Amino acid sequence: MVLDTILPKAVLTGLAGIGAFIVAGKVISYIQLLLSLFVLSGKNLRTYGKKGTWAVVTGASDGLGKEYAIQLAQKGFNIVLVSRTESKLQTLASEIQTKYAGSNIQTKILAMDFAANRDEDYAKLKALVDGLDVGILVNNVGQSHSIPVPFIQTPKEEMRDIITINCMGTLRVTQIVAPGMVQRKRGLILTMGSFGGWLPTPLLATYSGSKAFLQQWSTSLGGELKGTGVDVELVLSYLVTTAMSKIRRTSMFIPNPRTFVKTTLAKVGRSGGAQKMAYTSTPFWGHALMQWWLENTLGVGGSFVVDQNKGMHQSIRTRALKKAERDAKKA
């Protein structure tokens, strides 16, 4: 070979060894991914409390939050439902109590507008959960942009609401609930993350930044609470068929809320596709395979990936604006 005449045999052997080491690392990583997704089970939720222990779910009236509440009730947890619309909370509470009447599942509700960030609302939440044996907190409350929008055109109110709801709301609720968990030496804090925070996302810059903040905060909190008996996990997801995503059809990469939540609760403590992030899980297999492929091929923050992400959201914005224009003409 030509290389034999240019490079010493020892150098070629060394390069071959490095290549084999890299390939072996990728193979092992992929095997670990498959085991985490399809073979190994997650932590038993009974670890966080016996039947009748409470779970607090924010953003509980629709989508993923509603599904978390229903499935946790099915597993024997009493549920504290927190969201903005009281009528929806009352309907869900009645649905849960009727559906699981034989299990004596209890519910409590609190209607609060997280965008308002009112001290009195958080005082009510504290009064509601004080004295309850809360074993699980699901930080699901969140808001995105109405449609993809350039940052410099983002309405100030929308920008403020996203940061206040996604960041301050999550932090303040956790600060109320977590001390009791630490005192009881058991608990699970699940926070909903997003691929929008993992991948830099042009035209969703404020939302992307808020979810990236939650990633760093949750991982830091996990490090702080290690050894206390309280588990912290940020759950990464790509698209799910919810009102926020405005997607109705499921696919290999887009589950419905029921499937996504069922997988998440079954895989607590398993990293799934989030192999390079402590205290983080990407539990749904379609999302996890996508994450692994990107991290091991194109990378996450490179210009090519960012440009592709921008193109996708520019297309979504264009279609949304055309639809709004058509609807305006019909009105």
Curated annotation (Swiss-Prot):
It comes from Botryotinia fuckeliana (strain B05.10). Pathway: Lipid metabolism; fatty acid biosynthesis. GO terms for cellular component: endoplasmic reticulum membrane. The keyword Membrane applies. This is Very-long-chain 3-oxoacyl-CoA reductase. Pfam families: adh_short. NADP(+) binds at residues 56, 113, 121, 140, 207, 211, 240, 242. The chain crosses the membrane at residues 11-31. Component of the microsomal membrane bound fatty acid elongation system, which produces the 26-carbon very long-chain fatty acids (VLCFA) from palmitate. Catalyzes the reduction of the 3-ketoacyl-CoA intermediate that is formed in each cycle of fatty acid elongation. VLCFAs serve as precursors for ceramide and sphingolipids. PANTHER family: HYDROXYSTEROID DEHYDROGENASE-LIKE PROTEIN 1, VERY-LONG-CHAIN 3-OXOOACYL-COA REDUCTASE. InterPro entries: 3_ketoreductase_fungal (IPR027533), NAD(P)-bd_dom_sf (IPR036291), Sc_DH/Rdtase_CS (IPR020904), SDR_fam (IPR002347). It comes from the Eukaryota. It is found in: Endoplasmic reticulum membrane. It is an enzyme of class 1 (oxidoreductase). PROSITE patterns: ADH_SHORT. CDD domains: 17beta-HSD1_like_SDR_c. Its EC number is 1.1.1.330. It is a single-pass membrane protein. It catalyses: a very-long-chain (3R)-3-hydroxyacyl-CoA + NADP(+) = a very-long-chain 3-oxoacyl-CoA + NADPH + H(+). Belongs to the short-chain dehydrogenases/reductases (SDR) family. GO terms for molecular function: ketoreductase activity; very-long-chain 3-oxoacyl-CoA reductase activity. Keywords: Endoplasmic reticulum, Fatty acid biosynthesis, Fatty acid metabolism, Lipid biosynthesis, Lipid metabolism, Membrane, NADP, Oxidoreductase, Transmembrane, Transmembrane helix. GO terms for biological process: fatty acid elongation; sphingolipid biosynthetic process; very long-chain fatty acid biosynthetic process.
